[in-house]
């Protein structure tokens, strides 16, 4: 069973609430932890020790010059999902930092986008039992058409 930290305790405490209310509460709370996430109006759809799913709508403030989600917004949701799944697993005394981000833009996006970040049981165990380390966090970013307009690789580190 995963070790609980403050972030995972918040998720567990709200897990019995109706999904719409839970999503809203997570988004507001996490937007206070990382203000840029709140400003971008990112919504947390699923949060667990093994997976975080976030969504960003194609709204005016996040659009590029052709009316699609800006490249930075695409990278932001990948970084947000991978960062929060990492944060669900590291001890409270650790700092979580992104070490590198690689984003390949494959085609224009269509509509809202969803990022799904996942960790293996081995990655979770490593994060929960070591004071410092790093790992590549898997993430898939999809648009409304069901396609992946970007491919991302996020390397996260934690240290005490």
Which residue stretches match the model-derived regions?
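Non-catalytic linker/capping segments at the edges of enzyme domains
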Residues: 1-53
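HotDog/MaoC-like acyl-thioester-processing domains
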Residues: 2-18, 109-110, 120-160
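Soluble, non-transmembrane catalytic domains of enzymes that act on hydrophobic metabolites at membranes
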Residues: 39-46, 51-57, 69, 138, ...
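Hydrophobic residues positioned within well-ordered beta-strands of beta-sheet architectures
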Residues: 54, 99-101, 115, 135-137, ...
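Hot-dog-fold acyl-thioester-processing enzymes
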Residues: 57-82
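Hydrophobic alpha-helical segments of small multi-pass membrane proteins
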Residues: 72, 76, 80, 100-104, ...
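Hydrophobic beta-strand-centered segment that forms part of the acyl-chain substrate-binding groove
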Residues: 84-120
């Amino acid at each position: 069973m995963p070790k609980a930290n403050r972030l995972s305790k918040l998720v567990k405490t709200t897990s019995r609430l109706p999904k719409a209310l839970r999503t809203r509460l997570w988004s507001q709370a996490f937007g206070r932890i990382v203000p840029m996430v709140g400003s971008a109006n990112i919504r947390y759809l699923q949060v667990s020790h093994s997976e975080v799913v976030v969504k960003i709508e194609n709204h005016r403030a996040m659009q590029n010059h052709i009316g699609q989600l800006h490249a930075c917004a695409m990278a932001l949701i990948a970084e947000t999902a991978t960062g929060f799944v990492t944060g669900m697993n590291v001890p409270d005394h650790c700092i979580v930092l992104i070490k590198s981000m690689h984003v390949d833009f494959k085609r224009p996006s269509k509509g809202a986008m969803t990022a799904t970040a996942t960790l293996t049981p081995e990655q979770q165990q490593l994060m929960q039992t070591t004071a410092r380390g790093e790992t590549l966090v898997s993430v898939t970013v999809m648009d409304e058409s069901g396609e992946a307009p970007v491919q991302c690789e996020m390397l996260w580190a934690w240290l005490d």
